[in-house]
């Protein structure tokens, strides 16, 4: 029997999907990411959303101002697609190195998405320009029609939006973000080299029973919502297989405690402090630690055509307790796995 590794030395990872918010929240959460990750794809769903080059430059500077001086971190900015967006603005931002990608939110699919896209036809000129540029499209893959059950919205999106879009623009590079279903896992697996996926720690670790059985656990509530266990297992099997077009994207999405623990609570898990240990645990449980570094540190840069990070970090097989809460100016943040014991710890 092969001895279990006690230390994992991996190339510094990147987070290919994160929400850093703004203001005091931004200042609180950025260091949890900048300490461990070389880069992060920053979501543009602020209020108002990031739709111009100037707005992205200003937001990038606010992020950099929140990075501790001893951290080496590069935020990668994204453009929020709207029905009225000018293709020239997107091209300008991409060519100037301001926009790394553009984000498609179906209108009202998630937090601060009311400005999102009402139909693919409305943004076709932008998407055609992105295809020519080789600029990645990042997709929140859920339909938002009221008659579609929330647990079916991802699968329906594949049929009615994603596949027709990819047939229409066959050279467009697409990241199917935070996939949550067996349907999506199989769709990405069977796709070509222009289609990739990010997967969150919560969707690998948990299913809807964990969120709903024995009481509602609001800090596991995120969008896309946790699905049944067969979908969780499909995601775990995909990453454990060493599939090279799936990579780390935490979708860390902080909300103040009073906005999570409410009669109408917000969607999102603040997992930045615990995500790396969570991913390592999943790969360990699946007997697939040999694929962990590629998922965390290699697959993403290769898909985006970016260089690998040149520094390394180490995780050790060591138990530690996740802090119960994190102070904000006038509230608290509850991290993913608050108060629980994790079995991998980043060596500092």
From Swiss-Prot:
Record's cofactor remark: Binds 2 Zn(2+) ions per subunit.
MF (Gene Ontology): dihydroorotase activity; zinc ion binding
GO BP terms in the entry: 'de novo' pyrimidine nucleobase biosynthetic process; 'de novo' UMP biosynthetic process
Uppermost EC category: hydrolase
Residues that bind Zn(2+) 1: 17, 19, 103, 251
Record's catalysed reaction(s): (S)-dihydroorotate + H2O = N-carbamoyl-L-aspartate + H(+)
Modified residues (N6-carboxylysine): 103
UniProt cross-references to Gene3D superfamilies, sorted A to Z: Metal-dependent hydrolases
UniProt cross-references to SUPFAM superfamilies, sorted A to Z: Metallo-dependent hydrolases
Pathway terms, separated by semicolons: Pyrimidine metabolism; UMP biosynthesis via de novo pathway; (S)-dihydroorotate from bicarbonate: step 3/3
GO cellular component terms listed in the entry, alphabetical order: cytosol
Keywords: Hydrolase, Metal-binding, Pyrimidine biosynthesis, Zinc
Superkingdom, taxonomy of origin: Bacteria
Requisite cofactors: Zn(2+)
Positions of Zn(2+) 2 binding: 103, 140, 178
UniProt: substrate binding residues: 19-21, 45, 140, 223, 255, 267
Active site: 251
Known EC number: 3.5.2.3
Subunit (UniProt): Homodimer.
HAMAP family xref list: PyrC_classII
Chain's role: Catalyzes the reversible cyclization of carbamoyl aspartate to dihydroorotate.
Protein name from the UniProt record: Dihydroorotase
Species of provenance: Enterobacter sp. (strain 638)
């Amino acid at each position: 029997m092969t001895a279990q590794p006690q230390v994992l030395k991996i190339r510094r990872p990147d987070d290919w999907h994160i929400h850093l918010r703004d203001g005091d929240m931004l200042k609180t959460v950025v260091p949890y990411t900048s300490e461990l990750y070389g880069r992060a794809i920053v979501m543009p769903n602020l209020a108002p959303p990031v739709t111009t080059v100037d707005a992205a430059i200003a937001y990038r500077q606010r992020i950099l101002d929140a990075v501790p001086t001893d951290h080496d971190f590069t935020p990668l900015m994204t453009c929020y697609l709207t029905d009225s967006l000018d293709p020239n603005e997107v091209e300008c931002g991409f060519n100037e190195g301001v926009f790394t990608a553009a984000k498609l939110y179906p209108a009202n699919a998630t937090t601060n998405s009311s400005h999102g896209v009402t139909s693919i036809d409305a943004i076709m000129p932008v998407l055609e320009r992105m295809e020519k540029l080789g600029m990645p499209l990042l997709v929140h893959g859920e339909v938002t029609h009221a008659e579609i059950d929330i647990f079916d919205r991802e699968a329906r999106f594949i049929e009615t939006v994603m596949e027709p879009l990819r047939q229409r623009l066959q050279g467009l590079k697409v990241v199917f973000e935070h996939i949550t279903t067996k349907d999506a896992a199989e769709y990405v697996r069977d796709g070509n080299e222009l289609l990739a996926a990010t997967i969150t720690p919560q969707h690998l670790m948990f299913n809807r029973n964990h969120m709903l059985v024995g009481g509602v656990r609001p800090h596991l509530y995120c969008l896309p919502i946790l699905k049944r266990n067969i979908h969780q297992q499909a995601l775990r099997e995909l990453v454990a297989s060493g599939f090279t077009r799936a990579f780390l994207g935490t979708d860390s999405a902080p909300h103040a405690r009073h906005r999570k623990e409410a009669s109408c609570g917000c969607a999102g898990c603040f997992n930045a402090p615990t995500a790396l240990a969570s991913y390592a645990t999943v790969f360990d449980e699946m007997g697939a630690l040999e694929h962990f570094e590629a998922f965390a540190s290699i697959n993403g840069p290769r898909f985006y055509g970016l260089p690998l990070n040149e520094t390394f970090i180490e995780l050790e097989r060591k138990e530690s307790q996740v802090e119960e809460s994190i102070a904000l100016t006038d509230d608290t943040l509850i991290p993913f796995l608050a108060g629980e014991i994790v079995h991998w710890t980043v060596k500092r």
